[in-house]
Amino acid sequence: FSRFAGVERELMLLTGDGLTLHFEDGQVCDLRPPHARVRFSGDRVLQGAPAGQVVSVLNLMWRRDDVVVSTWHRPLVGTVAVFLDPGDCWLVYLLAGQARLARTDARPLDQGDAVLLRAPHGRCHQVLDGGGELLLARVRSSATSD
């Protein structure tokens, strides 16, 4: 893995038998199915070893001085509302199943699809409808975080 000074990272296993991370300081972290994840500083030196032939990982990276990122792994059963504050950006990644954004002409989301949500004018919400599993990531400016 490349080193990225001043950057935070979060890795989440998407597919495969797993990934073992070996950090230079001796820490070992195993990402195992179905969707294990780990957050760490991009300043750290590490190597990754897949547990099988193929592994797929979602790699979120952000500048820690500029934004704060919160993530949630959630089931999607029916309707979920995502509340959007001005300046925030939400990543919705569909880990499994199908979903659609209500009140839009956007095509339905399938496993592996992602969508970015933003508040165009003031606080609002988007409604997701479907069934499956989601990874939600909220990106918020460090200046507005509590």
Which residues make up each language-model segment?
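Jelly-roll (double-stranded beta-helix
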Residues: F1-D146
